[in-house]
Regions:
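Surface-exposed receptor/substrate recognition regions of extracellular proteins
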Residues: 1-55, 64, 585
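Generic detector of short, aliphatic-rich beta-strand segments that form the cores of beta-sheets
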Residues: 36-46, 610-617, 624-626
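Intrinsic-disorder/low-complexity loop/linker signature
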Residues: 40, 252, 553, 617-619
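Structural signature of tandem-repeat unit edges
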Residues: 51-64, 73-86, 96-109, 119-132, ...
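Consensus positions within tandem repeat domains that build extended binding/scaffold surfaces
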Residues: 66-69, 88-91, 111-116, 134-139, ...
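Short, aromatic/basic amphipathic alpha-helical patches
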Residues: 575, 597-607
Length: 630
């Protein structure tokens, strides 16, 4: 049944009907007037034909415009009479032809999203009788240049004026106590505002993404600023708080306010919240009030001009990445109250020169001073027990450091690429030294390994080109891959009897190493273990070794003699004796028949120039030593 047919039927309805509700629509043509001398209420179901309405009048008998009454219609103007007391949710949603609205005195309520996405609305007057505006009521009304709220309004709901592109100013009624989430979010041209004196709450991202606002003053009545209230306000330069305000500043309050240069934090706050000032690239200085006891993760991350910060004297905790990327920060004084420093706290602070970690701190978290390229001096507390991963990685100007006497663990890559580090003394308390700990410390000349350490992890001293000697204690039972690889000045090194395997490349390219003794506890020798050790003249492999891997003595230019034990069961890889121009003696402590039974890779001796293997019962000839053995 069409709307026109329904209207005929509705003439018979009793005279006490007064409401338009739920999607009045249909295909009634371009002109439609809702009035009748006997009709006071029209009830319809939601329809899809509202896009056909272009002109619409509401008679003085109507008291309510219901939810979803005219979504997607094409009205150019609307006059709401004084008889109407409320306008329902989404009543005129997405009416893109609507340019003006007149709402008469008497209307008390505008529902949520009532005019949402009326993208060409340019003029609307709100009556003083209005007491409530629902969330999103004028969201996406992009061309609305101004609006005056009646004095009775106490709350501006979430998204009420969001995404307006023409607002330049806004006056708040004095009775407003709450501004909801994203209420003015993405109002890009909204200038400086005066917040009302009775305001207590500003919701999440209420003014986020504003491109014009340069300063704002927070009233002393405000107790909560929601997450990201002023986030991405790219031109905001100054924020003023009441000195003694009791206020909850939540996550991301000023994140990406790239021109923010001045903010006074109130004495009532206790926490600097997560990403509060992240990417505030023009913030140069800030004082953290003494009421603050903690700073959450990423609070000042990438504040690239921050060079002066005064911390709370009651601060106990600094979270992860708080000062990550603060490239202008050259010094900072940590109060004695600090007990914890989070992961990456000072990472990429490339101008930080010196710092003292207060007593009471027991652990340095991962990446704490990662790539602090100007750091020359660090004082560590006696209370320190654990040092995490990558703490000083890339700190190229750090020349020396004292590790406190109670430290038991130093994590992976802790001092990697500390290119100026010349010496370090490790405490006897140390039990664990992480992999790549001193990798790339090209000026490190000496380092002790304490007696409680049981493992030298892979690449621990990789490319320590100035290291001349190392004493490995008997407690060590494992030496990992490339542990001393590239230590070109290493002349002396010992392998304790507790070691059973020599992993790949342990002493690879140790060109100054003249001799090495392998203990008889070793059963396995990995690939290129002594590769490129140009000053070794002989290598005696002890009884007990069962596996010799590829390239064990690869390119040892001065090598003349190798002794292979009777215990060997397999020789892995091709060209095991390749690159030894002076090698003349390969002695096997077994018979020719036993030698022949050893498992070998195809062409294991190719390009070596070797003619025979000297066995206990005579020489084993290599008939064609370029291709196959006898």
């Amino acid at each position: 049944m069409s709307i026109a047919e329904r209207l005929i039927e509705l003439k018979l309805i009793k005279h006490n009907l007064k409401t338009i509700i739920n999607g009045l629509g249909g295909r009634c043509g371009e002109n439609f007037t809702l009035y009748h001398t006997d009709l006071e209420k029209l009830i319809t179901e939601r329809d899809t034909g509202n896009e056909y309405f272009t002109n619409f009048n509401i008679s003085d008998n109507i008291t309510k415009i219901g939810d979803y009454a005219f979504p997607n219609a094409k009205f150019s103007s609307i006059n709401v009479p004084s008889s109407v007391k409320s306008i329902g949710e989404r009543a005129f949603f997405n009416n893109r032809s609507l340019t003006s609205v007149t709402i008469s005195e008497g209307v008390k309520q505008i529902g949520s999203d009532a005019f949402n996405s009326c993208s060409n609305l340019e003029q609307i007057n709100l009556p003083q009788s209005l007491e409530y505006i629902g969330w999103g009521a004028f969201n996406n009304c992009r061309k609305l240049p101004r609006i005056t709220l009646p004095t009775n309004i106490k709350e501006i709901g979430s998204y009420t004026f969001a995404n307006n592109r023409t607002f330049t100013n806004f006056e708040f009624p004095s009775m407003v106590t709450r501004i909801g989430d994203s209420a003015f979010s993405n109002c890009r041209k909204l200038g400086n505002i005066t917040l009302p004196d009775n305001l207590t709450y500003i919701g999440r991202e209420a003014f986020a993404y504003n491109q014009v606002m340069t300063e704002v003053t927070i009233p002393d009545t405000v107790t909560t600023l929601g997450n990201g209230v002023f986030a991405y306000c790219m031109n905001l330069e100054k924020v003023t708080f009441p000195e003694h305000a009791i206020i909850n500043l939540t996550d991301g309050t000023f994140k990406f306010c790239t021109k923010l240069r001045e903010v006074n934090l109130p004495n009532g706050i206790t926490t600097i919240s997560y990403i509060m000032f992240q990417n505030c690239a023009n913030l140069t200085s800030i004082t953290i009030p003494d009421t603050v006891i903690s700073m959450s993760s990423n609070a000042f991350m990438n504040c690239t001009k921050l060079n002066d910060i005064q911390l709370s004297q009651n601060l106990t905790s600094i979270g992860n990445s708080v000062f990550y990327g603060c490239t202008a920060l050259s010094s900072i004084t940590l109060p004695n109250s600090v007990q914890t420093l989070g992961d990456s706290t000072f990472r990429e602070c490339t101008n930080l020169q010196n710092i003292t970690i207060p007593e009471g701190v027991t652990k340095l978290e991962n990446n704490l001073f990662f790539n602090c390229k100007s750091l020359t001096e660090v004082t560590l507390p006696l209370t320190l027990v654990t040092m995490g991963l990558n703490i000083f990685l890339g700190d190229t100007l750090l020349t020396n450091i004292t590790i406190p006497k109670n430290v038991t663990t130093i994590g992976n890559s802790c001092f990697q690429e500390c290119g100026s580090l010349t010496s370090i003394t490790l405490p006897e308390s140390l039990k664990q030294l992480g992999s790549s700990c001193f990798n790339g410390c090209v000026k490190l000349q000496s380092c002790n390994i304490p007696s409680q350490v049981t493992r030298i992890e892979p690449a621990t001293f990789y490319r320590c080109k100035s290291l001349t000697s190392i004493t490995i204690p008997d407690s060590v039972n494992y030496i990992g891959n490339s542990a001393f690889d590239g230590c070109t000045k290493l002349q002396n090194a010992n392998i304790p009897n507790s070691v059973t395997r020599l992993e790949d490349r342990i002493f690879n390219n140790c060109v100054s190493l003249t001799n090495i003794t392998i203990p008889n506890t070793v059963t396995f020798i990995g690939q290129y273990t002594f590769g490129g050790c140009n000053n070794i003249t002989e290598l005696i492999i002890p009884e007990g070794v069962e596996t010799i891997s590829q390239g064990v003595v690869h390119a040892c230019q001065k090598l003349e003699k190798i002794v292979i034990p009777h215990s060997v069961k397999e020789i892995l890889g091709q060209g095991i004796f390749y690159g030894h121009p002076k090698l003349t003696d390969v002695i096997y402590n077994g018979t020719k028949e036993e030698w022949k039974k050893i498992k070998k890779a195809t062409n294991w001796w190719t390009q070596s120039g070797l003619a025979v293997i000297k066995c206990t019962d005579g020489d084993f000839p290599l008939r064609n030593y370029l291709t196959t053995e006898a």
